[in-house]
Amino acid sequence: MKSMIVKDSDFVFVPPPQLAWARRVLIKPCAGYPLPYPVTTSPRLLNAIIRGIRRISNADILIADGTPTGESIYPTYQALGYNFHHVLMLDIRDSIFIEVQNPLTEFYAVESFWVPNVVLRSDFLISVTPFKVSRSSGHFSVANLLSLLPVSKYRKGRSGGWETLYQLGIEKVLADLYFTLPFDLGIIEARQKFLYADDPQKGEVEDYGKILTGEPHEIDLKASKIAGVDCEHLKLINQGRVQLED
């Protein structure tokens, strides 16, 4: 799949040919907080993607995410203006979770993940995220997959989040997750760059005016070059690809 970087004003979502065969398309936005773009994925971009899918397919379209606290995401969807016609809005915490083995025999941190069945039952998977940089690492389409994992299984004590995974080394975990939960397409909403330190809800904003699309690892590499950061999980994914080819 060819990676593309276009001006946001010129962006029209043209789905890859294989999407035409899908009966169920799952879109994973970045929607964990009730704060607008660039903290979360904009409804404008999601609408453009939905329109593009509808032009070539009558597939069921699902939008799914979860909150870092493990609380219901529906009030957050409402706050973000996620109101789409004939699209099923799902809360990851309501899913049935199935343990899926990491295909890497020499995995980095996690041998298997608890994955929502709604992801496994979808035929085409799209990760849609803002352009976020935290200190020296980028949070792009691969890192966006973390909130598909159940807080109930990965929290530590009573606090929310995925603390047990962070303790294993989140960059290694993200590389393992990429192989265990392979997404077909990454879309990075880089109309603005969002730069933050510790709190993903507070940061600085820079205008950039682009939309990036492509295979998640490939497009994240392009985004990391634009941001001038080295993402360890993207390097580990490169090494993992070599392992799978051997």
Where on the chain are the PLM-derived regions?
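N-terminal and secondary-structure boundary signal
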Residues: M1-D246
